[in-house]
Amino acid sequence: MFNDIPVFDYEDIQLIPNKCIISSRSQADTSVKLGNYTFKLPVIPANMQTIIDEEVAETLACEGYFYIMHRFNEEERKPFIKRMHDKGLIASISVGVKDYEYDFVTSLKEDAPEFITIDIAHGHSNSVIEMIQHIKQELPETFVIAGNVGTPEAVRELENAGADATKVGIGPGKVCITKVKTGFGTGGWQLAALRWCSKAARKPIIADGGIRTHGDIAKSIRFGASMVMIGSLFAGHLESPGKLVEVEGQQFKEYYGSASEYQKGEHKNVEGKKILLPVKGRLEDTLTEMQQDLQSSISYAGGKELDSLRHVDYVIVKNSIWNGDSI
């Protein structure tokens, strides 16, 4: 069965244009609804320590973008929820599945966040299912995102447990080495895995990992994603919390994976690595460029909104999209 699945990734696909029906790309609507909220773009900066902190989260929320705060400053999560609610902003946090997280979730009853993401590397597990059920019992109004997974069976099981959305992607990210360390994952066929999982889904799918260009966002939506989580494209900005490093007169920001020894603080069960990225400028400029490029994608799709991307045809051009050019 598995060997019958078409295997391809982002660089192997080109979308086929339809007749344009808008006079300017600025007429294209890139907004997306998740739960009871509408956001400006279908993108989420990865919930990683070198991508997002409280300041970046607040900026994103103020500007109408979705965000997920990482879970690695555990004692700061509850004050963060209060801070966001005091400012009239949505609170979106991450939790793990260890025993103490159950008490933490229960403690949120008086000030429940709008979104909770259960964030572990291998999300198709009883521990995630039990945490979904616990959150839904304690905080029934909270939107639960669960992951990460890579199969239709996992999507169905997490949805049946009560997840409101599932996050698809096992190790396709730029600083993730799961496929090398374990032999498992969706690295190299993330887009095909997304297509496979979305066919089984009844609720939103969040594509997580493997995004290298803005065009990959449109491709993700074409193959079933409601939103797209992105790491490396959001790393390295002036506002990014990664450490600033100077090498031969050029400034770089650190970017490391959520299962790296740099994040974990120990050399144990490491599935991530650290790299240096040239400082890119302001996050706001990248978000604006993403929106403009996605508006262009919608115009090529022959529509006015994101849904038009779901209906375009495509061709598989194995590894030839760059024609030898680097990106």
Curated annotation (Swiss-Prot):
Pfam families: IMPDH
Catalytic activity: IMP + NH4(+) + NADP(+) = GMP + NADPH + 2 H(+)
UniProt key word NADP: yes
Gene3D superfamilies assigned: Aldolase class I
Active-site feature positions: 176 (thioimidate intermediate)
GO MF annotations, alphabetized: GMP reductase activity
Entry's Gene Ontology cellular component terms: cytosol; GMP reductase complex
Alphabetized InterPro entries for the sequence: Aldolase_TIM, GMP_reductase, GuaC_type_2, IMP_DH/GMP_Rdtase_CS, IMP_DH_GMPRt
Statement: the UniProt record of this protein carries the keyword Transferase: no
GO terms (BP aspect): purine nucleotide metabolic process
Binding site residues for NADP(+): 205-228
S-S pairs: none
Keywords: NADP, Oxidoreductase
EC number: 1.7.1.7
NCBIfam families (UniProt xref): GMP_reduct_2 (TIGR01306), PRK05458.1 (NF003966)
Function statement: Catalyzes the irreversible NADPH-dependent deamination of GMP to IMP. It functions in the conversion of nucleobase, nucleoside and nucleotide derivatives of G to A nucleotides, and in maintaining the intracellular balance of A and G nucleotides.
Protein family membership: Belongs to the IMPDH/GMPR family. GuaC type 2 subfamily.
Protein name (Swiss-Prot/TrEMBL): GMP reductase
Organism placement in taxonomy: Bacteria, Bacillati, Bacillota, Bacilli, Lactobacillales
Gene name linked to the record: guaC
